C-alpha cells in the first residue's frame, strides 16, 4: 500500500524518441532537473536538460524565509502575510523576523534596536573612499562599492561558523547601510554629510541623514 502511495507522487515520462518510460519523483509540486538527465537516446548521450531563460518556471532553492505568488499577489515573510506585518510590526521587527525566524519579544527588540543604533557610524576611511567617486556617479554604484569595502574593515567577518559573529555582522549591515545610502545620496547632490543621530529611531535617523 505504501509503495502505491509513493508511486502516485511521481511523473511518468514517455520518450517518444526511444519508446522508454521514466518515473520522475514529484515533491511539493516540483521535480529535480537532474532527474531528467537519465533520459537519453544512447549510452553516450549527455542526457535531457531543461531550458528556462530567466527562471520563469524554475525554483532555484527552497526558502523558509519568503513565499511569493506574484500572480495572486501573495507575499509572506516566515509565514506572516506582508499586510499583517505592515500593519502591526516595525521595520526592525520585520528585519529580526527575517533573520531569526520569529518576531522578537520586547526584550529581544530592545537589544536588537540598541545593537543596531550603536553601530550606525562608519569608519572615516570609508568616507575618504566615497569621496573618490565622481560627482555624477550613480548612487547605487557608489553604495555597491562602499558596502563591499566594509569587508576590509572587519576581517573577523570571515568566521562564518560562529553564531555570535554572524549576529554582529547582521547588526553591522543593518546599522551601516542606511548611513552609507544617505552619504551616497548626499555626495551625488554635492551636499555635506549628515551623521547618524542615535536619539532618533531607525527610520527617523535615515530620513534625517538623507534630507536634513
Regions found by a protein language model. Give the residues of each.
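N-terminal mitochondrial targeting presequence
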Residues: 1-3
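Hydrophobic alpha-helical bundle cores within soluble ligand-binding/oligomerization subdomains
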Residues: 5-212
Amino acid at each position: 500500500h505504501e509503495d502505491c502511495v509513493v508511486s502516485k507522487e511521481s511523473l511518468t515520462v514517455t520518450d517518444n524518441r526511444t519508446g522508454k518510460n521514466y518515473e520522475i519523483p514529484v515533491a511539493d509540486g516540483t521535480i529535480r532537473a537532474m532527474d531528467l538527465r537519465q533520459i537519453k537516446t544512447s549510452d553516450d548521450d549527455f542526457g535531457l536538460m531543461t531550458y528556462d531563460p530567466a527562471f520563469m518556471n524554475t525554483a532555484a532553492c527552497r526558502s523558509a524565509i519568503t513565499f511569493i505568488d506574484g500572480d495572486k499577489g501573495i507575499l509572506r515573510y516566515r509565514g506572516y502575510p506582508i499586510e499583517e506585518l505592515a500593519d502591526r510590526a516595525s521595520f526592525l521587527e520585520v528585519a529580526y523576523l527575517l533573520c531569526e525566524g520569529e518576531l522578537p519579544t520586547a526584550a529581544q527588540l530592545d537589544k536588537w534596536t540598541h545593537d543596531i543604533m550603536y553601530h550606525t557610524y562608519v569608519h572615516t576611511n570609508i568616507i575618504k573612499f566615497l569621496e573618490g567617486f565622481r560627482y555624477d556617479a550613480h548612487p547605487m554604484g557608489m553604495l555597491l562599492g562602499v558596502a563591499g569595502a566594509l569587508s576590509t574593515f572587519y576581517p573577523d567577518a570571515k568566521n562564518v561558523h560562529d553564531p555570535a559573529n554572524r549576529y554582529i555582522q547582521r547588526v553591522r549591515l543593518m546599522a551601516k547601510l542606511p548611513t552609507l545610502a544617505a552619504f551616497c545620496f548626499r555626495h551625488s547632490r554635492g551636499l555635506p554629510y549628515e551623521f547618524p543621530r542615535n536619539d532618533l529611531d531607525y527610520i527617523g535617523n535615515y530620513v534625517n541623514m538623507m534630507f536634513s
